[in-house]
Amino acid sequence: MEQKTMSIELREKNGKGVARKLRAQDVVPGVVYGKGIEPVSVKVAAKDLAATIAGEGGLNSLITLSGGGSLNGNIVIVADMQRNPLKGDILHVDFHRISLDEKVKVHVPLVMVGTAAGVKEGGMLDVVTYSLDVECLPTAIPEAINVDVTNLAIGHSIHVSELVLPAGIKVLNDPETPIVSIHGKAKEEAPAAE
């Protein structure tokens, strides 16, 4: 996975009033925490954060911090992000400092690939699970896990245990968790004309 770089600054003051003032200046308040460090309050330009988590890697992007005193050069991933429910603006972000040689737990989106045979027969595709919790080395985090639904027939499902996963990826979800199924009746053939 591609590593990205993002500039941050240390934040000396905390609280709702300070956070509101930062957001009014298009700056997102945040915190960096992780193994071996005390949580550190930071701030990042909203446009820089949005650009960093857009595209390849998304929220699971490996981010090298630039600036921020002792945080300079640290590698983080987005652990949590709060958004304004109406506007979608990022209100706060939590960064988790990681080591490239220690496994991390992340959410990885699932992407349905192909047109299911059951859909062609008149059934309806029902996606039940949209992401999986996985554990892997940071450099092995997949952008997404593809689920091939091409051979899925009416009345059948694909479960977590049936997925073909990239090497080094351990799924933390229950293996019997359904991911996608096909419901409905097959198209009836038109009766022959007499």
From Swiss-Prot:
Cross-referenced InterPro entries: Rbsml_bL25/Gln-tRNA_synth_N (IPR020056), Ribosomal_bL25/Gln-tRNA_synth (IPR011035), Ribosomal_bL25_b-dom (IPR020057), Ribosomal_bL25_C (IPR037121), Ribosomal_bL25_long (IPR001021), Ribosomal_L25_dom (IPR029751), Ribosomal_uL5_bac-type (IPR020930)
A biological-process GO annotation: translation
Cellular component aspect of the GO annotation: cytosolic large ribosomal subunit
GO molecular function annotations of the record: 5S rRNA binding; structural constituent of ribosome
Keywords, ordered alphabetically: Ribonucleoprotein, Ribosomal protein, RNA-binding, rRNA-binding
Superkingdom: Bacteria
Record keyword rRNA-binding present: yes
rRNA-binding in keyword set: yes
Annotated family: Belongs to the bacterial ribosomal protein bL25 family. CTC subfamily.
NCBIfam families: bL25_bact_ctc (TIGR00731)
Complex formation: Part of the 50S ribosomal subunit; part of the 5S rRNA/L5/L18/L25 subcomplex. Contacts the 5S rRNA. Binds to the 5S rRNA independently of L5 and L18.
Matching PANTHER family: RIBOSOMAL PROTEIN L25/GLN-TRNA SYNTHETASE, ANTI-CODON-BINDING DOMAIN-CONTAINING PROTEIN (PTHR33284), RIBOSOMAL PROTEIN L25_GLN-TRNA SYNTHETASE, ANTI-CODON-BINDING DOMAIN-CONTAINING PROTEIN (PTHR33284:SF1)
HAMAP family on file: Ribosomal_bL25_CTC
Known role: This is one of the proteins that binds to the 5S RNA in the ribosome where it forms part of the central protuberance.
Protein's UniProt name: Large ribosomal subunit protein bL25
Species of origin: Geobacter sulfurreducens (strain ATCC 51573 / DSM 12127 / PCA)
Gene (UniProt): rplY
